[in-house]
Amino acid sequence: MAIFITGTDTNVGKTIISTWICLHLGWGYFKPIQTGGNSDSDFVSSTTGVPAYDSVFSFPDPIAPHVAAKMSGSSIDILKIQLPEYRKSLSNKINSIPTTEHGRSKFISATTQTKYWEKENNKIVIEGAGGVLVPLQENGTKMVDLIQHLNVPVIIVSRSTLGAINHTLLTLEALQAREIKVLGIVINSMCEDFLDYNSKAIAEYGSTEILATFPYLKEVTRDSILSVQMGDSMKALLESTLKCKNSLL
């Protein structure tokens, strides 16, 4: 099962937070729509060692998805985007390969690693492109429609800077209008000047939980991301949400 990571804007830190969750919980990663190449998937996979599933739509230009698709002479059909299928393990090929504490191999091809991982752990972090109202098609289909199509709960990544309150409350309203479940907010400290009142205002006026405040990192590396502890309450929430989701299938 899966959770969806969206943000209040582009470059708000969705990939960093996705990487953080994958590192601490050992979940796989899936970015169904990518613009600007496969840099996000490559970063998460190389940083965490978990499988990064191939994007369904990937475009070379780092611009809005519907524009990138048009420039590439194609279009985005969200009905073609499904949660990755679970395949059989190739455990006979990896028994002698070093593993991490999550049972994931450190040195293994992406295909083989993904198949092994799926047997042990089928939980996935899905990362969106841009914010929830970014257009995907010229017919008006937006990222929020993809989230609704996948039927997965959402975590919103917000900035800690000026303007975050408005952007976050607008994002919440867009999701709530579609009756999409929001697990909570992660505040990403994108600079050293952290505005503490943002968190309080978002929690109060958005009637939602601040799951975590991610600190400003001067260097973004595996070690620096892993050094940011994930609270037990957030871990428990994510695990219980997916267990509950599984029980309904």
Curated annotation (Swiss-Prot):
Principal localisation: cytoplasm
Enzyme class: ligase
Chain sites annotated for binding substrate: T35
Subcellular location: Cytoplasm
Keyword set includes Nucleotide-binding: yes
GO terms of biological process kind: biotin biosynthetic process
Binding site for Mg(2+): T15, D40, E127
Reaction equation(s) it catalyzes: (7R,8S)-7,8-diammoniononanoate + CO2 + ATP = (4R,5S)-dethiobiotin + ADP + phosphate + 3 H(+)
Keywords associated with the record: ATP-binding, Biotin biosynthesis, Cytoplasm, Ligase, Magnesium, Metal-binding, Nucleotide-binding
Cellular-component GO terms for this entry: cytosol
Catalytic site positions: K31
Superkingdom per UniProt: Bacteria
E.C. no: 6.3.3.3
Organism: Neorickettsia sennetsu (strain ATCC VR-367 / Miyayama) (Ehrlichia sennetsu)
Protein name in UniProt: ATP-dependent dethiobiotin synthetase BioD
Pathway: Cofactor biosynthesis; biotin biosynthesis; biotin from 7,8-diaminononanoate: step 1/2
Binding-site positions, ATP: 11-16, 40, 127-130, 188-189, 215-217
PANTHER family in the record: DETHIOBIOTIN SYNTHETASE
Function per UniProt: Catalyzes a mechanistically unusual reaction, the ATP-dependent insertion of CO2 between the N7 and N8 nitrogen atoms of 7,8-diaminopelargonic acid (DAPA, also called 7,8-diammoniononanoate) to form a ureido ring.
